[in-house]
């Protein structure tokens, strides 16, 4: 019987390495796909490992700039903070991984794609809903969800089938990382009362170890896109990396969050997002300077919905695409410079300027240069308060009667 082809999202870890052998037993030829999202792994090694374990072909694709410009940028412009805290580090990468899985599957004539998610996480939903949106005819296989092995059983299977066991297997943590940040769960972090140990962090310094002098960074934006740091232009992926190092050195972007997962459970995770939190903070301040009040007050409602859609795996949904159009319209005048102070875990905006600034000092000042028409206030107050005044008059008459 002719073997079918499956494209596997491959990380190089135990789960997806074992999945190669498991899928072979199901009569599949496996094509491994590894994406460089800026996590800092030796991906050339990962690519070769897939072949050594049994994949017939192995892809390694650098998608850092695509991830930065088409995913992280949109999240920054929408100030996406799930439950007010989490900047969607892992959730942002899943639709891009799904997109590349589908592209390679179609290119290779594969009938299925596979991922290494468990049956209790959000990522299985994000992958599978995204894949269905892009190609509803592809079969989706989730080996880890299907085999339901304990860690000990999985290791035993790996040893029986000569699957290399990672040297960091004893680490209690489950880590996911990309340009936008780093997420960490499991081990002692499963106790919401326990303080995260320092070895749970990698991108940021503990406050005790951060510099005792602040560092200032000027971030330049053009139409909502961060383009410069301290006057130096960068491709967006490099700007994010550079800012991760700058802000991380000052302990910016540590987040300890008990979140409500899509699958109905609560999960305690620790995130490090130095660049993400700094950029979101700076971008919001520039919007405050350049957006009219009505847009500035309405946009957070759209941001909340976009955040939920991304977290819930609905990146490719019709509603998400419609909300994108609103978001892009709001960014046309978000051009300017924001000065941020990085100090002891904080990214503090201390200055902002823009050629599209709607702040008029002559209208805002209380000095002799004031040009605000104070006399106009009387008529404005009369008309603005008229509905309230009429309501009060009518109801007081009823009480008196």
Swiss-Prot record:
Reactions mediated catalytically: L-citrulline + L-aspartate + ATP = 2-(N(omega)-L-arginino)succinate + AMP + diphosphate + H(+)
EC annotation from Swiss-Prot or TrEMBL: 6.3.4.5
Places the protein is found: Cytoplasm
Keywords: Amino-acid biosynthesis, Arginine biosynthesis, ATP-binding, Cytoplasm, Ligase, Nucleotide-binding
UniProt GO MF annotations: argininosuccinate synthase activity; ATP binding
Keyword field contains Ligase: yes
This protein's pathway: Amino-acid biosynthesis; L-arginine biosynthesis; L-arginine from L-ornithine and carbamoyl phosphate: step 2/3
InterPro entries: Arginosuc_syn_C, Arginosuc_syn_N, Arginosuc_synth, Arginosuc_synth_CS, Arginosuc_synth_type_1_subfam, AS_cat/multimer_dom_body, Rossmann-like_a/b/a_fold
A single GO cellular-component term on record: cytoplasm
Gene Ontology annotations of biological process type: argininosuccinate metabolic process; L-arginine biosynthetic process; urea cycle
Residue positions binding L-aspartate: 118, 122-123
Protein residues bound to ATP: 9-17, 116
SUPFAM superfamilies: Adenine nucleotide alpha hydrolases-like, Argininosuccinate synthetase, C-terminal domain
Enzyme class label: ligase
Main localization category: cytoplasm
Pfam family, one: Arginosuc_synth
Binding site for L-citrulline: 86, 122, 126, 174, 183, 259, 271
PANTHER family referenced in this protein's UniProt entry, alphabetically: ARGININOSUCCINATE SYNTHASE (PTHR11587:SF2)
Family assignment from sequence similarity: Belongs to the argininosuccinate synthase family. Type 1 subfamily.
Subunit structure: Homotetramer.
Name assigned to this protein: Argininosuccinate synthase
Species of origin: Bacillus cereus (strain ATCC 10987 / NRS 248)
UniProt gene name: argG
């Amino acid at each position: 019987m002719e073997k079918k082809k499956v494209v596997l999202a491959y990380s190089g870890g135990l789960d997806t390495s074992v999945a190669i052998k498991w899928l072979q037993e199901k009569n599949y030829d496996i094509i491994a796909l590894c994406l460089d999202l800026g996590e800092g792994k030796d991906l050339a090694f990962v690519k070769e490992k897939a072949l050594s374990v049994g994949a017939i072909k192995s892809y390694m694709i650098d998608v850092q700039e695509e991830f930065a410009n088409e995913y992280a940028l949109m999240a920054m412009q929408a100030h996406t903070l799930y439950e007010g805290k989490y900047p969607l580090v892992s959730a942002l990468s899943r639709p891009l991984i799904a997109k590349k899985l589908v592209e390679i599957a179609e290119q290779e004539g594969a009938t299925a794609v596979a991922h290494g998610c468990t049956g209790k996480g959000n990522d299985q939903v994000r992958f599978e809903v995204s894949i269905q949106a892009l190609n509803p005819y592809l079969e989706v296989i989730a080996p880890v969800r299907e085999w339901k092995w304990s860690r000990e059983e999985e290791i035993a299977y790996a040893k029986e089938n000569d699957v290399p066991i990672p040297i960091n297997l004893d680490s209690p943590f489950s880590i996911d990382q990309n340009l936008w940040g780093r997420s960490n769960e499991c081990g002692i972090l499963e106790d919401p009362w326990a303080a995260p140990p320092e070895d749970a962090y990698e991108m940021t310094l503990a406050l005790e170890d951060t510099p005792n002098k602040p560092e200032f960074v000027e971030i330049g934006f053009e139409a909502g896109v961060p383009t410069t740091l301290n006057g130096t232009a960068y491709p967006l992926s490099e700007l994010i990396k550079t800012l991760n190092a700058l802000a991380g050195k000052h302990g910016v972007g540590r987040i300890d969050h008990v979140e409500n997962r899509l699958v109905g459970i609560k999960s305690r995770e620790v995130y490090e997002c130095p660049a993400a939190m700094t950029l979101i903070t700076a971008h919001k301040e520039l919007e405050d300077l350049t957006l009219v009040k009505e847009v500035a007050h309405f946009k957070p409602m759209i941001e909340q919905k976009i955040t939920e859609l991304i977290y819930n795996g609905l990146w490719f949904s019709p509603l998400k695409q419609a909300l994108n159009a609103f978001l892009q319209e709001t960014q046309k005048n978000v051009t300017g410079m924001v000065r941020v102070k990085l100090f002891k875990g904080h990214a503090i905006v201390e200055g902002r300027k823009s050629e599209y600034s709607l702040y008029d000092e002559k209208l805002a000042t209380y000095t002799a240069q004031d040009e605000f028409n104070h006399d106009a206030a009387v008529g404005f107050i009369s008309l603005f308060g008229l509905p309230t005044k009429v309501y009060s008059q009518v109801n007081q008459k009823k009480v008196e009667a």
